């Protein structure tokens, strides 16, 4: 079996955190005899600087040829003034859509060692373990028509479109039920069906799919209520399935329940579990080059990659256990540091995880 992984370090802290993730990947590869081939390229601002495009055609072909893609982060202020169609984020949107990565998995898992890092009371978040499944290739981020125009009265107007087809909803709903079946058998579908036509179709199709999953407890929630409930009582949720924009917002909100977005991995999968894996956090240009970024989200993204694309659960478990051991040792990067723990940099944290494997 081909086991080629395309490594895209990206922008900002991307290259720093990726170096640590690759260190862990190489160690686990050697320990488990997995035989990965690593191929390197650029995405985002780094790709724009090198190729004149945030996603070069040859990079896309490499991504198609690979079994999985591991990404650092994209974006930075130095590209804010270029043509919007060439911004780093457009490369990320394009690679997701071109690879057919329609399902984005964002876990929010609270490590007991970091219970104090959450801004919520420990009793509200203790034992938190939820998964947000976000539809990734449809909805308002891709909908046409979109644009700007000047009205007859001279006023500027901008507009976007939020379309969803039945097939797009059906496949993400099916993925949601499948994930719920692997976990706590509870699925909450989040929409805005009291206002949006797209959400009304969403809810109807989710209900249809539910008939094939009688063992899963399905509930529906409006997105405004879901945002409130995530803060009020987050442990009521097991798997949340929602559209592109709602999922974008709710998954970032859920990430802070855990205390640091620097701890959270994500996976974007196609229909065959080929995927792109990346940390939930951004490129953090304000700390780039300082050696203080938290590499654990990227390292845990490697674990997700091993679990979902390569079906190497033992190797994935080993990485997750190693991260737990490092936290038990009291090692913390600046974003998760608290009194009584030891502050370490990016490289030292990566080395500690390798040593714990």
UniProtKB/Swiss-Prot annotation:
InterPro entries: IsoCit/isopropylmalate_DH_CS, IsoPropMal-DH-like_dom, Isopropylmalate_DH. One of its GO terms (cellular component) is cytosol. NAD(+) binds at residues 76-89, 282-294. It comes from the Bacteria. Mg(2+) binds at residues 224, 248, 252. It is found in: Cytoplasm. GO terms for biological process: L-leucine biosynthetic process. Binds 1 Mg(2+) or Mn(2+) ion per subunit. The record marks 141, 192 as: Important for catalysis. Its main location: cytoplasm. Its EC number is 1.1.1.85. Substrate binds at residues 96, 106, 134, 224. Pathway: Amino-acid biosynthesis; L-leucine biosynthesis; L-leucine from 3-methyl-2-oxobutanoate: step 3/4. Its cofactor is Mg(2+); Mn(2+). PROSITE patterns: IDH_IMDH. Keywords: Amino-acid biosynthesis, Branched-chain amino acid biosynthesis, Cytoplasm, Leucine biosynthesis, Magnesium, Manganese, Metal-binding, NAD, Oxidoreductase. Disulfide bonds: none annotated. Catalyzes the oxidation of 3-carboxy-2-hydroxy-4-methylpentanoate (3-isopropylmalate) to 3-carboxy-4-methyl-2-oxopentanoate. The product decarboxylates to 4-methyl-2 oxopentanoate. This is 3-isopropylmalate dehydrogenase. It comes from Xanthomonas euvesicatoria pv. vesicatoria (strain 85-10) (Xanthomonas campestris pv. vesicatoria). The lineage of its organism: Bacteria, Pseudomonadati, Pseudomonadota, Gammaproteobacteria, Lysobacterales. The gene is leuB.
């Amino acid at each position: 079996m081909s086991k080629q992984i395309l490594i895209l370090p990206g922008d900002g802290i991307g290259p720093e955190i990726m170096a640590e993730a690759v260190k862990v990947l190489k160690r686990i590869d050697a320990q488990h005899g997995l035989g990965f081939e690593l191929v390197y390229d650029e995405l985002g601002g780094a790709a724009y600087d090198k190729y004149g495009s945030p996603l070069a055609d040859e990079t896309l072909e490499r991504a198609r040829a690979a079994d999985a893609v591991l990404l650092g982060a994209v974006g930075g202020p130095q590209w804010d003034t270029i043509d919007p169609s060439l911004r780093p984020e457009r490369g990320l949107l394009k690679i997701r859509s071109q690879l057919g990565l329609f399902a984005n998995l964002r876990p929010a898992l609270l490590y007991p060692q970091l219970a104090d890092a959450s801004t919520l009371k420990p009793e509200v978040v203790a034992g938190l373990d939820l998964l947000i499944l976000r539809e990734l290739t449809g909805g308002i981020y891709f909908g046409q028509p979109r644009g700007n125009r000047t009205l007859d009265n001279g006023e500027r107007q901008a507009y976007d479109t939020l379309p969803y087809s039945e097939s797009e909803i059906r496949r993400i709903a099916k993925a949601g039920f499948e994930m719920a079946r692997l976990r706590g058998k509870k699925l909450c579908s989040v929409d805005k069906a009291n206002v949006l036509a797209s959400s009304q179709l969403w809810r109807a199709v989710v209900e249809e799919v539910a008939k094939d999953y009688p063992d899963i407890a399905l509930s529906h929630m409006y997105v405004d209520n879901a945002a409130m409930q995530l803060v009020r009582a987050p442990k009521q949720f097991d798997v949340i399935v929602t559209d592109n924009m709602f999922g974008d917002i709710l998954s970032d909100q859920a990430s802070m329940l855990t205390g640091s977005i620097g701890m959270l991995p994500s996976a974007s999968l196609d229909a065959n579990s080929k995927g792109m894996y990346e940390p939930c956090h951004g490129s953090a240009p304000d700390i780039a080059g300082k050696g203080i970024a938290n590499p654990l989200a990227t390292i845990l993204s490697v674990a997700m990659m091993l679990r979902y694309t390569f079906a190497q659960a033992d190797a994935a478990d080993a990485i997750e256990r190693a991260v737990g051991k490092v936290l038990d040792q009291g090692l913390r990067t600046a974003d998760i540091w608290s009194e009584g723990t030891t502050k370490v940099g990016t490289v030292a944290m990566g080395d500690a995880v390798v040593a714990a494997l």
